[in-house]
Amino acid sequence: MSDEDDVDDVDAEQDEVESDKEIEEWEDYRKETEEASEEWLPTPITEAMMKEGLSLLCKIGSGLAHAYIKLEAKDRDLTDISLLRSYIHLRYVDISENHITDISPLNSLTHLLWLKADGNQLRSARMNELPYLQIASFSYNQIIDTEGIFHPRLGSLDLKGNRIHQVTGLDPERLSSLHTLELRGNQLESTKGIYLPKLKNLYLAQNLLKKVEGLENLSNLTTLHLRDNQIETLNGFSQEMKSLQYLNLRSNMISDLAELAKLRDLPKLRALVLLDNPCADETDYRQEALVQMAHLERLDKEFYEDDDRAEAEEIRQRLKEEQDQDLDPDQDMEPYLPPV
């Protein structure tokens, strides 16, 4: 494994630790804002606020005119962004940590590339198709579904910390560029509805999932986070998931080590996390994982050594010999003697 691969694994775990801390902080923030919601006063964004938040002067159109293309209007207690309809040249918009319930004014921003609307009171991320939007973040709102999201160049979509029960409306034809989907910390009861062929990174931790289903054909998926769910079995994985390298199943309910055999068809899986599952308390836990998945390089936080691999290979060979004997029809058969 290359040094770059090592760094990728460390980055994945570090991102997870930081995200866990972020979720806790946002949950505290959400409780505070919900308690204070009755005290919110209507606060529309004003020209003065726009003047303060605008930056990045660029040429527009034929290059003879100029306009500011970046707006930061974060944490201003905003409830209304209607004024943005007239700022059609904006490409980068941050309206996080406000009290916004309606983002329809953003439909006019047809040049928008980057949108951050975290920590508001949105119940939907629905917008008109924005042809150039590449990154959109709606984390820690009150969003209840995934309908109305169809931007052809959207590569990263963050919906963590919302109230989504089911994934619907994510059309692979209209989200053909989506490579990263963040749904951590919702109320998902199923992984169905996520057939997005270009998807590389999928974050489903801290939901209510009991099984994996509907992900079998995600052939480009490299990272799958399923931590802190209620998964008991490892059904739902297939050899079509030929790019999957990192699988995090920490803090689920997997008790039977035999379930690990269902991961053998993942040809590129090299890092698996199963900490805080009942099966991780078994005596032969690490050995059994390597016996089932010869290509595995790391289990939880520890890498396998050469001695571990040699021992696992011996066990595999012994099991194969025993299986071959069981299948041999001539083994231990009494010789046939014709009657006298």
Swiss-Prot record:
Keyword field: Cell projection, Cilium, Coiled coil, Cytoplasm, Cytoskeleton, Flagellum, Leucine-rich repeat, Repeat
Span of domain LRRCT: 277-315
Tissues expressing this chain: Expressed in the testis (at protein level).
Chain coiled-coil ranges: 305-328
Residue stretches of biased makeup (Acidic residues): 1-27, 323-333
Subcellular location per the Swiss-Prot or TrEMBL entry: Cytoplasm, Cytoskeleton, Flagellum axoneme; Cytoplasm
Ranges for the LRR repeats: 89-110, 111-134, 177-197, 198-219, 220-241, 243-264
Gene deletion effect: Mice show male infertility due to impaired sperm motility but do not show compromised respiratory ciliary motility. Disrupted assembly of radial spokes seen in the sperm flagella.
Disulfide bond residue pairs: none
Region Interaction with RSPH9: start-end pairs: 205-340
InterPro entries: Leu-rich_rpt, Leu-rich_rpt_typical-subtyp, LRR_dom_sf, SDS22/Internalin_LRR
Any one Gene Ontology BP term: radial spoke assembly
Description of how the protein assembles with itself and partners: Component of the axonemal radial spoke complex. Interacts with RSPH3A and RSPH3B. Interacts with RSPH9.
Protein name: Leucine-rich repeat-containing protein 23
Organism, scientific name: Mus musculus
Source organism phylogeny: Eukaryota, Metazoa, Chordata, Craniata, Vertebrata
Encoding gene per record: Lrrc23
